[in-house]
Amino acid sequence: MLRTSLTKGARLTGTRFVQTKALSKATLTDLPERWENMPNLEQKEIADNLTERQKLPWKTLNNEEIKAAWYISYGEWGPRRPVHGKGDVAFITKGVFLGLGISFGLFGLVRLLANPETPKTMNREWQLKSDEYLKSKNANPWGGYSQVQSK
């Protein structure tokens, strides 16, 4: 007896029926293109209407409403807007390669105009004498003190 009364009550409170009408196709057509330019009040109204429609079974929603609900929830607008526009990536890439080209060109020019003679401290004789001097002073006995650079 108690069990039958509980099951009858459960059957009566099963589904919630919200009295909402479908949004017009004119409201939802090209929503991603128009969304940014719409007034905030109209954006809020469309979002609220779609929220109410989503409380119904999803089979009652048409494709335009599903696409609009997805775009409002997850689309590329507001904080999800891409950081770079369509032509920005190519512009940045060209700028990076231009900067690298100028850098390498400037480096080559400086090397070309630099003194072609090597400094006297890069001479092998100088480096051997530096080794002898450091050995006489007992400099860095653990790690070594070799000043000779192999070529």
Curated annotation (Swiss-Prot):
Pathways involved: Energy metabolism; oxidative phosphorylation
UniProt subunit comment: Component of the cytochrome c oxidase (complex IV, CIV), a multisubunit enzyme composed of 12 subunits. The complex is composed of a catalytic core of 3 subunits COX1, COX2 and COX3, encoded in the mitochondrial DNA, and 9 supernumerary subunits COX4, COX5A (or COX5B), COX6, COX7, COX8, COX9, COX12, COX13 and COX26, which are encoded in the nuclear genome. COX5A is the predominant subunit V during aerobic/normoxic growth, it gets replaced by COX5B under anaerobic/hypoxic conditions.
Organism the protein comes from: Saccharomyces cerevisiae (strain ATCC 204508 / S288c)
Coiled coil: none
Function, in words: Component of the cytochrome c oxidase, the last enzyme in the mitochondrial electron transport chain which drives oxidative phosphorylation. The respiratory chain contains 3 multisubunit complexes succinate dehydrogenase (complex II, CII), ubiquinol-cytochrome c oxidoreductase (cytochrome b-c1 complex, complex III, CIII) and cytochrome c oxidase (complex IV, CIV), that cooperate to transfer electrons derived from NADH and succinate to molecular oxygen, creating an electrochemical gradient over the inner membrane that drives transmembrane transport and the ATP synthase.
Miscellaneous information on this protein: Present with 2250 molecules/cell in log phase SD medium.
InterPro entries attached to this UniProt entry: Cyt_c_oxidase_su4_fam, Cyt_c_oxidase_su4_sf
Membrane topology listed for this record: Single-pass membrane protein
Induction (UniProt): By low oxygen levels (hypoxia) at the level of transcription. Repressed by ROX1 in the presence of oxygen. Not expressed until the oxygen concentration is below 0.5 uM O(2).
Principal subcellular localisation of the protein: mitochondrion
Transit peptide residue numbers: 1-17
Family: Belongs to the cytochrome c oxidase IV family.
One biological process term in Gene Ontology: proton transmembrane transport
Keyword line: Membrane, Mitochondrion, Mitochondrion inner membrane, Oxidoreductase, Transit peptide, Transmembrane, Transmembrane helix
Location within or outside the cell: Mitochondrion inner membrane
GO cellular component, one term: respiratory chain complex IV
UniProt-recorded name of the protein: Cytochrome c oxidase subunit 5B, mitochondrial
Gene symbol of the encoding locus: COX5B
